[in-house]
């Protein structure tokens, strides 16, 4: 079964909201000492929508539910410290990293309740910048929503006998997504030279992501009663997954997860001031940004890591 996104609904006002949300987060994110302030200046969703195939529909993994119970206290405290509330935003974005370490006991495998293709140990991912401060937030607030339309109906997971149907049942979608995107994201920053004194020299940098190719499996779990949506991607295609999601077998050494999910990322770079000498399309800089993007996907969304959207009240 295929799922269609109403891509025309992603207009400029939604892009502006996303830019504002990104810049709010970037302004409070730690950066390496050699990187100046980072600002997103433009964003365009592009004209190409992803090709989404529904591979499987099942009950939600208990790992999502158990992690939610541990995250409740952290989540409530985070909302108190923020100027944003559920009444002002459509949903709240909470990183799993805010509650890491509060899961199952040390001597109990975290994967014992999961199907075979999801049984991977819970671990702490490596930092993409190694010895430099992390550029990842522990909590983000996002105030945008994406219109969704399902082409063909599908039966929800099993409902126990003798119970009234839940208007918002828990269900989990396994999707195979192929997206040859022509989105465009432009940001500016600067390279700081801190010798012989701090900020002795600043070199402007302009980076533009002009497109990417995403090809992989994504798990989307909807927790109806709590109105939460969990996102993650399996670390590897497995024999237990349906053939449509397994993809083409690879010969030789497997590719890194980030490169498998994002085999192509197109980036344009400019270093220097526009009215003076400018270096364009610097290969090393572009490769560095590609590595950062892929590493971020690995550390934020590849199991055992996942993200959760806390939806606002539906009013019903």
Curated annotation (Swiss-Prot):
Topology relative to the membrane, per the entry? Peripheral membrane protein
The SMP-LTD domain covers which part of the protein? 1-312
Keyword Magnesium (UniProt): no
Q: Name where it's found.
A: Mitochondrion outer membrane; Endoplasmic reticulum membrane
Entry keyword annotation includes Endoplasmic reticulum: yes
Molecular function via GO = lipid binding
Signal sequence segment: none
A Pfam family per the record: MMM1
BP GO terms, sorted: mitochondrial genome maintenance; mitochondrion-endoplasmic reticulum membrane tethering; phospholipid transport; protein insertion into mitochondrial outer membrane
Matches recorded under PROSITE patterns: SMP (PS51847)
Q: Which GO terms describe its cellular component?
A: endoplasmic reticulum membrane; ERMES complex
**The organism sits in which domain of life?**
Eukaryota
Any idea which UniProt keywords this protein has? Endoplasmic reticulum, Lipid transport, Lipid-binding, Membrane, Mitochondrion, Mitochondrion outer membrane, Transport
PANTHER family xref list: MITOCHONDRIAL DISTRIBUTION AND MORPHOLOGY PROTEIN 12 (PTHR28204:SF1)
On assembly, the entry states: Component of the ER-mitochondria encounter structure (ERMES) or MDM complex, composed of MMM1, MDM10, MDM12 and MDM34. A MMM1 homodimer associates with one molecule of MDM12 on each side in a pairwise head-to-tail manner, and the SMP-LTD domains of MMM1 and MDM12 generate a continuous hydrophobic tunnel for phospholipid trafficking.
Please give the function described in this protein's UniProt entry: Component of the ERMES/MDM complex, which serves as a molecular tether to connect the endoplasmic reticulum (ER) and mitochondria. Components of this complex are involved in the control of mitochondrial shape and protein biogenesis, and function in nonvesicular lipid trafficking between the ER and mitochondria. MDM12 is required for the interaction of the ER-resident membrane protein MMM1 and the outer mitochondrial membrane-resident beta-barrel protein MDM10.
Q: Which family does it belong to?
A: Belongs to the MDM12 family.
Comment field on protein domains:
The SMP-LTD domain is a barrel-like domain that can bind various types of glycerophospholipids in its interior and mediate their transfer between two adjacent bilayers.
Official protein name in the record:
Mitochondrial distribution and morphology protein 12
- The record lists the organism as Postia placenta (strain ATCC 44394 / Madison 698-R)
Gene transcribed to yield this protein: MDM12
């Amino acid at each position: 079964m295929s799922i269609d996104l109403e891509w025309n609904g992603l207009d400029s006002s939604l892009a502006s909201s996303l830019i504002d949300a990104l810049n709010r987060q970037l302004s409070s994110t730690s950066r390496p000492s050699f990187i100046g302030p980072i600002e997103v200046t433009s964003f365009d969703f592009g004209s190409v929508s992803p090709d989404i195939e529904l591979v499987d529909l099942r009950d939600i993994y208990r790992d999502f539910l158990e992690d939610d119970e541990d995250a409740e206290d952290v989540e409530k405290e985070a909302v108190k410290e923020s100027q944003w509330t559920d009444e002002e935003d459509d949903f709240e974005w909470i990183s799993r990293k805010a509650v890491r370490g509060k899961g199952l006991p040390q001597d109990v495998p975290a994967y014992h309740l999961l199907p075979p293709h999801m049984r991977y140990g819970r671990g702490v991912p490596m930092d993409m910048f190694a010895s430099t401060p992390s550029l990842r937030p522990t909590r983000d607030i996002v105030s945008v929503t994406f219109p969704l339309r399902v082409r063909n109906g599908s039966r929800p997971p099993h409902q126990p006998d003798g119970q009234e149907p839940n208007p918002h049942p828990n269900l989990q979608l396994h999707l195979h997504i192929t997206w040859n995107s022509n989105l465009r994201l432009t940001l500016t920053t600067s390279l700081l030279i801190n010798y012989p004194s701090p900020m002795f020299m600043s070199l402007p940098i302009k980076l533009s992501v002009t497109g990417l190719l995403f090809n992989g499996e994504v798990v989307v779990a909807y927790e109806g009663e709590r109105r939460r949506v969990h996102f993650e991607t399996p670390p590897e295609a497995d024999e237990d997954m349906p053939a449509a999601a397994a993809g083409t077998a690879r010969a030789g050494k497997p590719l890194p997860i980030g490169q498998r999910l994002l085999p192509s990322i197109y980036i344009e770079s400019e270093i220097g001031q526009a009215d003076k000498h400018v270096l364009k399309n610097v290969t090393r800089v572009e490769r560095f940004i590609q590595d950062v993007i892929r590493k971020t996907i690995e550390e934020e969304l590849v199991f055992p890591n996942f993200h959760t959207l806390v939806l606002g009240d539906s009013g019903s």
